[in-house]
Amino acid sequence: GYEACLEILDLIDRAGPEDLFLCVMSGGSSALMSCPVDGISLEDEQKTTDILLKSGAGILEINAVRRHISRMNGGRMAQRIADRGAELIGFNISDSVSNPPTRDISIPWEHYYGTPMGPDQTTLQDALACIEKYNLHSRLPASVTRYLASCGPAGETPKAFPQNTYYQINTLPDSAAAAQRAAEQLGLRAVVLSTFIEGEAKDMGTLMASIAREIQAYHRPVPPPCALISLSLIH
């Protein structure tokens, strides 16, 4: 992922006002595009992510830190494209629990936030607050805490790209509906449990297992064989 990011950045740096970037991204793209700012090594960025995931922080809190130490995420790839005077059209497959079903994919998405091709809704202060809240000063790599404490306004991520156009082509409710149809075509009873689940993987795994045991033992909320569909954002 790191080498690919360097190639993408090199491509952007050779662009000009006559160029158009078509970006197609799905949930998890930012996790694959690891490219830390100067002064922070890839190893330190990876260590930071691991510590954050084990800290009990929520996904937005984690992203606030990760985005502010990245050359790609937090909209910084899009900012780099804008700095070259080029145009960006983005197509997004969303894994966010907050997005409603897609009504018409031909209508631009006016309130798109996403990394690395869209503006960032987190702030540098959010990143610093996360470190303070979970007492991570002594646990995170010194290069990370030093950068976040000293970067100032120049280290803030971009908050708007009015010149760009974004399209939402799929959301969690869309995926749930498609999975339900596919299961029913196979002759299974299909139930969408939720598209709003957020939390830690171990907790969600325990929850799903308990529901499966309930079905096996007491045939509720539906009798087997069945398909239980749950789309979530877990970490």
Describe every region a protein language model picked out.
Residues 1-18, 65-66:
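Glycine-rich oxoanion-binding loops at beta->alpha junctions
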Residues 6-11, 70-80, 207-217:
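Conserved phosphate-binding catalytic cores of ATP/NTP-utilizing and phosphoryl-transfer enzymes
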Residues 12-18, 24-25, 70, 79-86, ...:
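Solvent-exposed alpha-helices and their adjacent loops that cap or buttress functional pockets
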Residues 22, 60, 89-93, 191, ...:
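Hydrophobic/aromatic beta-strand patches that form the interior of the parallel beta-sheet core
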Residues 30-34:
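Short glycine/serine/threonine-rich phosphate/pyrophosphate-binding segments
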Residues 38-51, 55-139:
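Internal gly/pro-rich beta-alpha loop/helix module
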Residues 85, 89, 113, 117-207, ...:
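Accessory alpha-helical/coil subdomains and C-terminal extensions
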Residues 234-235:
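Conserved small/polar residues in nucleotide/adenosyl-binding loops
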